[in-house]
Amino acid sequence: MLVDRVENNEKQQQQMASSSDAMSDSSLSDDEIIEHVVHGKEPKSTYELSWVSNAIAWSGALVWPLMLTVPLLLSSMYSPISYRQVFPESWYVYDTLSNCAPKPLGLVLGILAVAVGQVFVWIFFYLFKFGYLGTDPRSIQSKGAREYIFREGLLTHIGQPEGFVLLIGYLAITWMLKLMPQSYYSFEGTIQYKELFMCLVLQDGIQYTMHVLEHIVSPAFYQMSHKPHHRFTNPRLFDAFNGSLMDTFCMIIIPLFVTANLVRHCNVWTYMAFGSSYACWLTLIHSEYVFPWDGIFRKLGLGTPADHHVHHKFFKFNYGHLFMWFDQLGGTYRDPSGFAPRVFRENV
């Protein structure tokens, strides 16, 4: 009997030891190993852990609808903060045929829409950059992402006079001087998604053309306008609007004005949605990291950070920003995978 007990104890110890070794080889936590060995509970498989991690990472995709927070909440009749309930009628009813100056409410809300969208982008990027969304981010370039203090990057992004300061000035002048089509001053309805899509495509198409011209018109003009932005050959998210006043005027202001006068039937909510989604997307494609949705975006021809890194690294490819369609048509598109692993990481 004693011999049988000793043999049984030895077998149990061997089983526990082998289980412990197997657990340590599977990269499980100490708590999970204890639960398995002592209490007989099965740990989560690598697949389950991977699925959970991916799901958390993909939760960052909520940043896309959150860009439209202000126009969605204020324009919906079902919203508790619908503009009709929040603002007096005299603040938004405006006779476009009169000689009176436009009401500034639409302008203020438009700037607010962009600001709120940007805040959601910053929050998402902070959580993503520091690994709070399931996994540590992968840098696009093989040499790794630039190191910087997040607060410094954010303050640099906000404080660029050629960025938000110039854009706010443009919005104020065109709105208050009635340089926009009449429908843009209307608060009726909600976001018009067809017109929103048309604005984004036209804006990027015109911006693509201006971008190419900035590169080829003359070396002197390039040095004055676009070269300051191209000093970032390994850009970070906060470099999006870091350039020159001339660059912003040529590549953003002119396309914005032309787009507004081509897509002439937007209401104020669509204009807000366009401004916010455009500014946020332009910011995101300067990211130094790969986002979970980049693979899907690339299959659809939508702009990703890796696509834009190709332009910053080589200068003569991928002039588009939001869409790669114009580069594909013009023969200037290059897939980031073509430069891996020497310049870019695999599968970016």
From Swiss-Prot:
Its EC number is 1.14.19.-. GO terms for cellular component: endoplasmic reticulum membrane. Residues 197-332 form the Fatty acid hydroxylase domain. Its main location: endoplasmic reticulum. Residues 1-26 are annotated as: Disordered. A motif (Histidine box-2) lies at residues 226-230. It catalyses: squalene + 2 Fe(II)-[cytochrome b5] + O2 + 2 H(+) = (S)-2,3-epoxysqualene + 2 Fe(III)-[cytochrome b5] + H2O. Keywords: Endoplasmic reticulum, Iron, Lipid biosynthesis, Lipid metabolism, Membrane, Oxidoreductase, Steroid biosynthesis, Transmembrane, Transmembrane helix. Residues 12-26 have a biased composition (Low complexity). GO terms for biological process: sterol biosynthetic process. The activity of this enzyme is not inhibited by terbinafine, an established inhibitor of the conventional flavoprotein squalene epoxidase. It is found in: Endoplasmic reticulum membrane. A motif (Histidine box-3) lies at residues 308-312. The chain crosses the membrane at residues 55-75, 105-125, 153-173, 243-263, 277-297. Its cofactor is Fe cation. A motif (Histidine box-1) lies at residues 211-215. It is a multi-pass membrane protein. The keyword Flavoprotein does not apply. Residues 1-10 have a biased composition (Basic and acidic residues). It comes from the Eukaryota. The histidine box motifs may contain the active site and/or be involved in metal ion binding. Belongs to the sterol desaturase family. PANTHER family: STEROL DESATURASE. Catalyzes the stereospecific epoxidation of squalene at the terminal double bond to form (S)-2,3-epoxysqualene, the first oxygenation step in sterol biosynthesis. Interacts with cytochrome b5/PHATRDRAFT_30770. This is Alternative squalene epoxidase.
